[in-house]
A protein has these predicted regions:
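Bacterial Sec-dependent N-terminal signal peptides
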Residues: 1-21
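Sec-dependent signal peptide cleavage junction
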Residues: 18-34, 220, 340-351
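Short, conserved catalytic-motif segment at the N-terminal edge
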Residues: 21-73, 95-100
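Active-site SXXK
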Residues: 30, 43, 49, 71-99, ...
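Short, glycine/proline-biased beta-turn/loop segments that scaffold the active-site neighborhood
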Residues: 97-112, 197-199
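Short, surface-exposed loop or secondary-structure junction motifs
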Residues: 113-300, 304
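Short, gly/Ser/Thr-rich active-site loops of penicillin-recognizing serine hydrolases
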Residues: 288, 323-351
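Short, well-ordered beta-strand elements
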Residues: 294, 305-307, 312-322
Length: 351
């Protein structure tokens, strides 16, 4: 039976953020998404360092699956925030410097004598996107580390360091490789040692830890159907981690409480307001006067957003394994609900 699109504006009384987040309005919004097959995912909201809202939506529309509150989502490039934190921990420990040249580790990479660790972190290195070759994604099936490294060298650079900001997956693969050189262990072991154990995370894992109970990717064509996504072992340190939304909020809250890195290091991670959109592992997300810092992640079927507002100590973690309208619209509406502002429900085609 076709569901009619609810074409109306949702008005919420009040204009200022209150200490109590309106869970009923959040439920109404997610009920609308769910009823219209708008997405499949999970939402967690933290306020003052603890969870005040958690809900999954849409999963019951999936055929022949089992899931629970511990089922993980692929968080795609939110993984890069973790990699940046790990690199900056090395900086704090004096084991590497932001101005260390890439040539100290991989002199065979083009322009490595000019590219610094800082350039790699902030997407100003000039390196490209190893995952796309000849205009197509070629990491759908498992490839070797050598294949990836050869592609990075072949693509080279498209501009000189610091000339501009261009998002670079290749830069973060290299940062992961540098981490493994410095620690003399694989990325998933570093994540376990430096992130998972200190924060007592239950449902957070890099792909080589073989995480179980993880959602597959889906696409909607009259119904939700499983689709093939990238091979996550090809993007370790770039987009391979799986997590619950709750564990993601624990991480970003702990980050802004200076439990993972020092305050001055966190300030370095953040983009400079008025000058940058991208920092060194954190990006700026503006929703009117409300400023959040965090990271986004998108692959073929999975999408994730993790953002934190330092002023109000609010964090929003949102992951999907199937969606039919842009995540930025979804999250903007969530922010409007939290701050008691007017917004328009997204139009979702019915079949």
């Amino acid at each position: 039976m076709k569901l009619k699109l609810l074409a109306f504006l949702l008005f919420i009384s009040g204009n200022l953020f209150s200490q109590e987040i309106n869970k009923e309005n959040l439920d109404d919004y997610l009920n609308y998404i769910e009823a219209n097959n708008g997405g499949i995912g999970s939402l967690s909201i933290f306020k003052d360092d603890h969870e005040v809202y958690n809900r999954s939506f849409g999963q019951e529309k999936l055929p022949n699956i089992t899931f629970n509150q511990d089922t993980k989502y692929q968080i795609a490039s939110v993984t890069k925030m973790i990699t940046a934190i790990l690199i900056l921990q090395l900086v704090e420990d004096g084991k590497i410097k932001l101005d260390t040249k890439l040539s100290d580790f991989y002199p065979e990479i083009p322009n490595s004598q000019k590219i610094t660790i800082k350039n790699l972190l902030e997407h100003t290195s000039g390196l490209g996107n190893f995952a796309v070759r000849n205009g197509a994604i070629w990491v759908m099936d498992k490839v070797t580390e050598k294949d990836i490294f050869d592609e990075i060298k072949k693509q080279g650079v498209t501009f000189e360091p610091n000339e501009k900001v261009v998002y670079s997956n290749s830069a973060y693969i290299i940062l992961r490789m540098i981490l493994e050189k410095k620690y003399k262990k694989e990325y998933h072991k570093i994540v376990e040692q430096k992130i998972i154990k200190p924060l007592s995370l239950r449902d957070f894992a890099s792909v080589k830890s073989n995480p179980e109970n993880t959602f597959k990717s889906y696409k909607f064509t009259e119904s939700w159907n499983e689709i093939k996504d990238i091979e996550y072992s090809n993007v370790v340190g770039v987009g391979d981690i799986a997590s619950t939304t709750k564990d993601l909020n624990i991480i970003i809250t702990s980050l802004f409480q200076n439990k993972i890195i020092k305050k001055e290091t966190l300030d370095l991670m953040k983009p400079i307001l008025g000058k940058e959109d991208w920092g060194r592992g954190l990006a700026l997300f503006e929703y009117g006067e409300n400023l959040f810092f965090g990271h986004s992640g998108d692959v073929i079927g999975c999408h994730s957003r993790l953002i934190y507002n330092p002023k109000d100590k609010i964090s929003i973690s949102y992951s999907t394994n199937g969606e039919r309208f842009p995540a930025n619209i979804f999250v903007e509406n969530l922010v409007n609900i939290i701050y008691s502002k007017e917004f328009k429900l997204p139009e979702i085609k019915t079949f």
